[in-house]
């Protein structure tokens, strides 16, 4: 879909099974989602899974997006997962794999009316490569990740000039380094207290006004560890934010 000015009507859910589950189960679970008034889903893709059986991978993925759209649910596919980031994937030797994967996935889905936007990477900073580094080494590694994100966003845009692009950042504080590469910026929020959660939204509103781009929260709520559903969704409502 073309970028919207406002994503506050998005009511989404992360769907880790996604295109991998049987069609009968998929239709049943999407029906549950619609009964809860949910209208979008975010799914994790895998380049290495694609590489094993490209044709089968693309067939299942396309069928998922079409089935979800028939149920009134748009899809945000995640191309790369930062949680499982392998440092070698940031090097030149991986570029050909990334290029072929992005080309085939984007060409398969770019014409689908149910495609909400491309999420180039989930949580680029949430991995040992970044977390275990300190000081200047951490800055250097983070810039290397950002270089990969910029290249990947550029690859997507060259293949699809219509549909929106985002990056699902771990924290609001990670967003600005690549905000120029996206149409919509997105962040995750698992912070434990209202004050910290509010600060993320205030920072998002300030950045949105400054760069002229909309935003949404593409992951939130984690019972027993962080923000409970009632608190997190209430704050989204107060800040007119889609999730």
Feature locations, PLM:
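Active-site mouth of glycoside hydrolases
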Residues: 1-182, 191-195, 210-211, 220-228, ...
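Active-site-flanking ligand-binding surface segments in enzyme catalytic domains
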Residues: 201-219
């Amino acid at each position: 879909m073309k970028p919207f000015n406002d994503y506050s009507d998005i009511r989404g859910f992360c769907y880790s099974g996604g295109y991998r589950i049987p069609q009968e189960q998929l239709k049943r679970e999407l029906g549950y989602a619609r009964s809860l008034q949910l209208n979008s889903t975010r799914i994790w893709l895998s380049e290495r899974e694609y590489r094993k059986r490209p044709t089968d991978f693309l067939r299942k993925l396309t069928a998922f997006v079409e089935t979800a759209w028939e149920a009134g649910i748009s899809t945000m596919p995640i191309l790369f997962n930062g949680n499982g980031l392998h440092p070698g994937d940031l090097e030149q030797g991986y570029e050909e794999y990334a290029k072929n994967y992005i080309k085939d996935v984007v060409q398969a889905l770019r014409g689908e009316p149910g495609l909400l936007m491309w999420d180039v990477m989930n949580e680029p900073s949430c991995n040992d490569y970044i977390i275990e580094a300190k000081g200047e080494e951490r800055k250097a590694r983070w810039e290397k990740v950002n270089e990969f994100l910029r290249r990947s966003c550029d690859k997507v845009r060259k293949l699809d000039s219509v549909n929106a692009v985002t990056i699902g950042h771990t924290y609001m504080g990670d967003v600005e380094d690549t905000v120029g590469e996206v149409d919509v910026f997105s962040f995750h929020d698992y912070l434990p207290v209202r004050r910290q959660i509010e600060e993320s939204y205030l920072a998002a509103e300030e950045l949105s006004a400054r760069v002229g781009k909309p935003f949404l929260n593409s992951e939130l709520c984690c019972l027993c560890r962080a923000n409970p559903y009632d608190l997190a969704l209430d704050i989204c409502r107060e800040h007119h934010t889609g999730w």
